[in-house]
Amino acid sequence: MARRPSTDDLRSGPERFMALVKTTVPPVHPAGLPFIGAGLALAAAGRRNRWVRGAGLVAAGANAAFFRHPPRVPPTRPGVVVAPADGLICLVEDAEPPAELNLPARPVPRVSIFLSIFDAHVQRIPISGEVVAVEHRPGLFGSAELAAASEDNERNSVVIRTDTGAQVIAVQIAGLVARRIVCDLTTGDKVTIGDTYGLIRYGSRLDTYLPEGTDIQVLPGQRAVGGETILAELP
């Protein structure tokens, strides 16, 4: 049956235009506002010079796109783990969790997502639960596409324990250009699947470590949508 148009659907003029903008253009993460502001300030300061003005506007637009924070609708099925970020599934393998977490040194399933500079760089909670550990480790800034990035690059690890006792680890990894990891979580936080918890600036990688026996639902080469794509189902 056809849907009756709502009052919002019948608006016209400026109100209708603004409504379309709000539903089409994603909001920006607060961490990106200083970078957008810097580009606009450059454009304003160089308004008499078209090259400077253009460079400032391009920089502001590029940062607005990079720091975009699109709304997502996570699945409601219990026991699923969603992608913590947008990007390309680059590795699906078994690997030991980060050593700084002091967890048992035995391989567990790991899914790695590479984020290019064109992906949205906010990170999202992969599964609901409680944060039981947050550990930052300094390191290199090599290409995040390489397998060695998981071990060599700077990283920030978050361990989430579900209501059933399963532990899922999300690891933010800095890349060749990305040199600033932002994580808003602390130990003891209660988190909900799909919520935003941080970001990495300008190209990076996300590793998700899963319990043994987890049923992986993705393959290398597949595109992931943060907060929506199901990476795995817990045993």
Swiss-Prot record:
Q: Does the keyword Zinc apply?
A: no
Topology in the lipid bilayer is annotated as: Peripheral membrane protein
Catalytic EC class: lyase
GO cellular component labels: plasma membrane
PTM (free text): Is synthesized initially as an inactive proenzyme. Formation of the active enzyme involves a self-maturation process in which the active site pyruvoyl group is generated from an internal serine residue via an autocatalytic post-translational modification. Two non-identical subunits are generated from the proenzyme in this reaction, and the pyruvate is formed at the N-terminus of the alpha chain, which is derived from the carboxyl end of the proenzyme.
| Pathway field | Phospholipid metabolism; phosphatidylethanolamine biosynthesis; phosphatidylethanolamine from CDP-diacylglycerol: step 2/2
A Gene Ontology molecular function term of the record: phosphatidylserine decarboxylase activity
What Pfam families does the entry give? PS_Dcarbxylase (PF02666)
- Mostly located where? membrane
Q: Which UniProt keywords apply?
A: Cell membrane, Decarboxylase, Lipid biosynthesis, Lipid metabolism, Lyase, Membrane, Phospholipid biosynthesis, Phospholipid metabolism, Pyruvate, Zymogen
Which reaction(s) are listed as its catalytic activity? a 1,2-diacyl-sn-glycero-3-phospho-L-serine + H(+) = a 1,2-diacyl-sn-glycero-3-phosphoethanolamine + CO2
Where in the cell? Cell membrane
A GO biological-process term: phosphatidylethanolamine biosynthetic process
Q: Is Metal-binding given among the entry's keywords?
A: no
Site features described as Cleavage (non-hydrolytic), chain residue numbers: 203-204
Task: List Pyruvic acid (Ser) occurrences by residue.
Answer: 204
Q: What does this protein do?
A: Catalyzes the formation of phosphatidylethanolamine (PtdEtn) from phosphatidylserine (PtdSer).
Q: Which NCBIfam families match?
A: PRK05305.1-3
PANTHER family found in the cross-reference section = ARCHAETIDYLSERINE DECARBOXYLASE PROENZYME-RELATED (PTHR35809:SF1)
In its UniProt entry, what is this protein called? Phosphatidylserine decarboxylase proenzyme
Query: Which species?
Result: Mycobacterium sp. (strain KMS)
